Amino acid sequence: MSEFDVATAAVQAALDAGARYADARVMHRRYESMSARNGDIEELTQDESIGLGVRALVGSSWGFHAVPELSEAAARDAGRRAAATATASARVPGPPVDLVPVPAAVASWASGCEVDPLGVPLSDKGDLLVRATGTMREHGADLAEGLYQIWDTTKWFVSSEGHRIDQHIRECGGGISATSIGDGETQRRSWPSYRGQYGTTGWELVTSLDLVGHAARIAEESRELLTAPECPSGETDLILGGEQLALQIHESVGHAIELDRILGWEAAFAGTSWLDLTRLGSLRYGSELMNVTIDPTIPGALGSFGFDDEGSPAVKRDAVRAGRWVGVLAGRDSAAVAGLGYGGSVRADGWARLPMVRMTNVGLEPGPHTLDEIIDATDDGVLMDLNRSWSIDDKRLNFQFGCEVGWEVKRGRRGRMLRNPTYTGIGPLFWRSMDMLSSEIVPWGTPNCGKGQPGQVGHTGHPAAPARFRNVRVGVRA
């Protein structure tokens, strides 16, 4: 049987068992990662899995069942079991469950890829990490680490509404970090971010990062941080680099606009949300420079796809427009509860997990400035970049972030390097203070977004650029 035949058999079995709606996903995923430390290969991981996951809706209740077997008998049994779980749950009825309509697509989609990352010889990939980490050690790092990761995923999706979709998504990326120790301090510098850069692309992304070319600089900067002055405490103008702003978006916007959190359906890992649907369309989230979109169509970004795991097509939507909150991340059922006309943001971490609302590419639209112009316009402030620590409350409201590095900004010039820079604030007040935003957008990839019970790891993208925020508390000590 083909993968589509397996999924179709599961859906039909669920319908025969009483489901009013059913869908099934066959997923085949290959994963590879390699890490190096101090000029030597540390670990190689290669994994492959394939299986079937089935959802069934009976009354107001969902059921789910997954199996690592693609026979017709296993598929039919999975469909029946998903329907049986939903039927049992429906004995204690909850609120009605409706699904926002979507076109019944019959389609194929694939992410862009110039160089198949799994086709690159292991020796070449390992040599890259060995040379990069070895160079960092030669330039003074006490600990030099490098990593790449690759995911190669094919999905086949069938629904009782007529969907028949296959997608092939390649994701890869990597990065390096240098850690130096001395005088009671431990300092780290990373490239291109503290966890690397990732996208729905091929090995060409890793090549473009030039890990070896940046290795000496970040090792030397990690040592320089050991003797740099501490970031001063107080209120000042804060300039954030794009990588740090990407995490700020992830934590204080992305999770907050997940509709399942807003409705109180989900609280694991990141709590619920301070947002209230009665204020959708009217709440002032940030300054007029703040334009945030939900856009899974960005070529090469980590949160991109052709269709989500409910068969909804990838569509760009506004989340915040000119500072006003106007959109959410939603699934078909949560959107119906909220009276919205769209889903499109539901994905699962593999065939054995139930699809849930996840971030896609949630990020800022470009501003009118450059980083140099922002620095030139700042009389007294601090520039910070690359995340080191994060803390945010269970409403996604109060936060404190630490960065790897800071620089003093005085009279329009970047000055001394600062160590242990931190800043704190309250989400909407912080975003309302943004008064300059660069046009230099990069879709930063986050491959480790945790959510759900049992836990799932999502891959998300966050287009971001340097920006300035006024009168921010910095240098906060724990």
Where are these regions (language model features)?
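N-terminal small-residue-enriched
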Residues: 1-478
